[in-house]
Amino acid sequence: MLSYAPENAYQRASTMENKKVFPKEKSGLHPRNRHRSRYDFDALSVSCPELIPFLAPTAYGDISVDFADPLAVKMLNKALLKHFYGIEYWDIPADSLCPPIPGRADYVHHLADLLASCNGEVIPKGKNIALLDIGVGANCIYPIIGQREYGWRFTGTDIDSHALSAAKMVVSMNPTLKNTLRLKQQKDPHAIFEGVWAVNERYDATLCNPPFHGSAEEAAATTRRKLHKLGKNEVAAKPVQNFGGKNSELWCEGGEEGFVSRMVAESVAKAQNCFWFTSLISKKTTLPAIYHALRYVKAVEVRTIEMAQGQKVSRFVAWTFLTLEQQAAWVAERWA
């Protein structure tokens, strides 16, 4: 066991009475998700010693980090990315989104299955497979996972120049990302594809974690509820996001429904330049409006892929304008 100054957290945990026994695997995660097992904090601490000061015994006698502490969550992510994905350098600004990695990995793996469903159940891999990450942020999570798991190359876009500067540092310090992740700034805050997608560029899929809320007040209220559930009874009027996030990452006019509806509308102009457009949808109540928008633009095929992490259920919606014949031609040209 690793020792922790000033007191061994594992020793404290092991001596606690009524230690709760947790299942060895997290329910609901994709079979290929590297994070199905419970966190091995011994192994993570070897990979990232900076995590050690943030480890402490829980009320159940287990070892964990304080998920209400943004710095602890950031250090856990840093350890996970180094241990599982070989990322030697990873740092993000204090106010940037620090997403839970297991859920993000699930999106990537289910997206791989979506591509495989059009390719004889074989996942297309390698640098020929190009993906567009809308809102890549400073964290670069989707490109990191997609490159490590499937060898895909990515273009990541964002409206925040500071986030892109941090992302560029992550790319420059990790050899595996230097030739597989290209970053572009979206200079029009009202545009999604326009301005960052060249006329001749083709993508096998897009992915996006859209802003969830419709206002800053709504985002703050959600954070207060999360902190209350985590046992933080004294919550400030302006609470700190435990997973971080700037305004542009957390909310936009119209919220999730408005953002994805605009994405659907813009996708028409790129109909023949992309196989699958996709976006996470956090609120189930958002789905009817998105389906309506997709019927309006006459998408040829629409799929909703459900995902689960414990009791939390999420999904992403995927749509394509390619006919079956066009899909077959795309596969033969790019995935063979």
UniProtKB/Swiss-Prot annotation:
Pfam families linked: Methyltransf_10
Similarity comment text for this entry: Belongs to the methyltransferase superfamily. METTL16/RlmF family.
Family annotation (InterPro entries): METTL16/RlmF, rRNA_lsu_MeTfrase_F, SAM-dependent_MTases_sf
Keywords in alphabetical order: Cytoplasm, Methyltransferase, rRNA processing, S-adenosyl-L-methionine, Transferase
Cysteine-cysteine disulfides: none
Reaction catalyzed: adenosine(1618) in 23S rRNA + S-adenosyl-L-methionine = N(6)-methyladenosine(1618) in 23S rRNA + S-adenosyl-L-homocysteine + H(+)
Keyword S-adenosyl-L-methionine listed: yes
Upper taxonomic lineage: Bacteria, Pseudomonadati, Pseudomonadota, Gammaproteobacteria, Enterobacterales
Domain of life according to the entry: Bacteria
Protein name according to UniProt: Ribosomal RNA large subunit methyltransferase F
SUPFAM superfamilies in UniProt: S-adenosyl-L-methionine-dependent methyltransferases
